[in-house]
Amino acid sequence: MTHDVVFLLDVDNTLLDNDRIADDLRAHLTGQFGAAGERYWAHFEELREELGYADYLGALQRYRADLDENGEAAHRLLSVSQFLIDYPFADRLYPGALEVLQKLAKTGPTVILSDGDVVFQPRKVHRSGIWKAVEGRVLIFIHKEEMLATVQREYPAKRYVLIDDKERILDAVKNIWGERLVSVFPRQGHYAHDPKNAGKYRKPDVTVERIGDLMEMDIGALAAG
């Protein structure tokens, strides 16, 4: 079935305040390892460069190799692992995020379109309540902007609305789908406010200061472009 419109939504810093999650992890690492905890973030950035997405568990595996696991460090490392696995992601949903998903669903199917690993990112989507809110319509890729043919095959539509905090992604998808796409930019998180991105990409079709602002918008008109 080809829908009139399908809504594609990113997760991190679009529906979920991932910057706060990272801040909480940084504080936990510092509490367990002091200044040495910063080595975790060095591995994190290395992996992001290599893989093209944030790999929190992969960075923890690399950080493990830096430690002497014969002592207390082994217990502290498990503490960090439990912190990540048990993190209350639902507490980091942006205000109105689930309500926006419900509102969009009245006009067309809502689909999560995210980058990430195949373990931690799905868990984040599950535990936050997002998975249930979109009825399991979740796609997680390494580079989602390169998987648009798969998106179209799985969720065929005359038009798409992409809601993403990264102007780079919005621009890349607009280059491929053209007028079939309505790009929506929620100005949330560190990517959205990075001055290096100012004027670098084409202006999104719609810009909102926070995801919850979509509750005040006419979704039918938004989908029509």
How would you label these PLM feature ranges?
Residues L15, T110, L162:
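Conserved SAM-binding loop
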Residues I21, Q32-A35, E45-I85:
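A metal-dependent, Asp-based hydrolase signature
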Residues M1-H43, A65:
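Active-site neighborhood of HAD-like aspartate-dependent phosphohydrolases
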Residues T14, V118-V119, R168, Y191:
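Conserved Rossmann-like nucleotide-cofactor binding loop
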Residues L8-D10, L113, L162-I163:
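Generic enzyme active-site microenvironment
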Residues D23, A27, L57, V118-P122:
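Short, surface-exposed alpha-helical segments at coil->helix boundaries
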Residues H75-A90, A97-S128, V138-I140:
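Substrate-recognition element of Asp-dependent hydrolases with the DxDx(T/V) motif
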Residues M1-D4, H126-L162, K166-G225:
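Asp-based, Mg2+/Mn2+-dependent phosphohydrolase catalytic module
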